[in-house]
Amino acid sequence: MSYLLALDQGTTSSRAIIFDEKGQIHATAQRETRIKTPNSGWVEQDANEIWSSQIAVIQQALASAHILAKDIKALGLTNQRETTVVWDKRTGKALAPAIIWQDRRAAQWCNTLIENGMLVQVQQKTGLRIDPYFSAGKLVWLLENIAGFRILAEQGHAAFGTIDSWLVWNLTQGAEHIIEASNASRTMLMNLSTQMWDEDLLNKFNIPAAILPKIISSDAYVADTAQGLLGSTIPITGILGDQQAALFGQSCFEVGSAKNTYGTGCFMLFNTGDQLQFSQNQLLTTLAWQCQNQTRYALEGSVFMAGAIVQWLRDGLGLIQHSAQVEQLASQVQSTEGVVLVPAFTGLGAPHWDSEARALLCGMSRGTTKAHIARAALEAIAFQVSDVLCAMQSDLSRPLKELRVDGGASQNDMLMQFQADILNVPVLRPKMLESTAWGAAAMAGLKAGVFTNLDEIAASWQLDRTFEPKMKNDERESRLCEWSQALKRAKSNLI
């Protein structure tokens, strides 16, 4: 039996999962990581805590599975994207807190770029919108605000990276300073056409090239873990950003295949093959993966509020005590009776990108109950995904045959059925919902010879349930119209 170790470093926790070659889980370990918000719009984590939590769960998972590091065939890594870490190469110590992808402190810098007419240029080069979401603005802020950092960077003594870079640096005890291609594509610094750092953008952003890591393919043999770290060395042979890892783990290898991950937010990725497709509908173009000497691209739509809506029902309104109770509450009514929730608590993501939009709950009457609100909350998740898919299909002129789903909220049968109904597309839920971690493990296994091709990985994907569309066309159109009207009222230009 071949064991594969997946490291899944997310926004709220560090995890380690041990799989076999069939995708069966043999051990899981998890440790939460703290998030700090020292100022309005700032979101940070302790980079050293990220590393210490990750090494701790590796050791815990090995102990739980009753195996040794020498029994692991390969290590795969997946991570929260865009999050930015800088450190001193000489000491290996972080020079500042990790700036998390949700952080908005670079908003003014981004606005200045937009005012200077760089929006189209940045999209054509990187596939991304100018937004504080991406790493470039975070790095510029650090260079301008951390005392002595720019000098260290120009002297070649400082390093920048995303979370994959930081973990690999520590796993190899400073031997490797790299960034994997799908992660690099989220920095707003990599040219998607050349798959190299864009010198023109670096000059315009005043970022020293000496600070940047080497871009490597998703299936590169990076190095072995350092001697003495885990008892025996383990080859690091697969790295992917978390959403790209989920696309790979869902075996969405064919052009036109798509997955949607239901977590705190929603992230839909649509495989566009080896062709760069630049969106005309405010979606992101991203690198899906590089493996077996081939590059695959994707269109991505990011929705800010999904599982977070259920958390609001629990913590903000007190309608439920536990998130899992939302389906039971919502099922007490057959419809929302006209109640619509637009969950723009932090603005609207793709394809609207309206940071000033505000949440709206409308259509209520004296007969409205908490069950109607709970049902409207679940439907709001599906409506937002529908907006993303509509934009994707407009860009690609290609109908979606099926949508593969994962993430915690995909276990909600009511939500998945409504998602299928409102999309008019079958929704497929796999038996194993750890698609992100499995994607990293499978990529590592492909390089390590556990798998010889993508078909062998695809064979491990097993269906749990298909949710077929049941809603009549006129009802679907009516519901989408209700959503559209509520959305217009929530957007900033109408408040």
From Swiss-Prot:
Gene Ontology BP annotations: glycerol catabolic process; glycerol metabolic process; glycerol-3-phosphate metabolic process
InterPro entries in the record: ATPase_NBD (IPR043129), Carb_kinase_FGGY (IPR000577), Carb_kinase_FGGY_CS (IPR018483), FGGY_C (IPR018485), FGGY_N (IPR018484), Glycerol_kin (IPR005999)
Free-text activity regulation comment from the record: Inhibited by fructose 1,6-bisphosphate (FBP).
Pathways per UniProt: Polyol metabolism; glycerol degradation via glycerol kinase pathway; sn-glycerol 3-phosphate from glycerol: step 1/1
Pfam family membership, one: FGGY_N
Positions with a binding annotation for glycerol: 81-82, 133, 242-243
Keywords: ATP-binding, Glycerol metabolism, Kinase, Nucleotide-binding, Transferase
EC number per UniProt: 2.7.1.30
GO annotation, cellular component aspect: cytosol
HAMAP family: Glycerol_kin (MF_00186)
Function: Key enzyme in the regulation of glycerol uptake and metabolism. Catalyzes the phosphorylation of glycerol to yield sn-glycerol 3-phosphate.
NCBIfam families per UniProt: glycerol_kin, PRK00047.1
Family: Belongs to the FGGY kinase family.
Name the record gives this protein: Glycerol kinase
Lineage, uppermost ranks: Bacteria, Pseudomonadati, Pseudomonadota, Gammaproteobacteria, Moraxellales
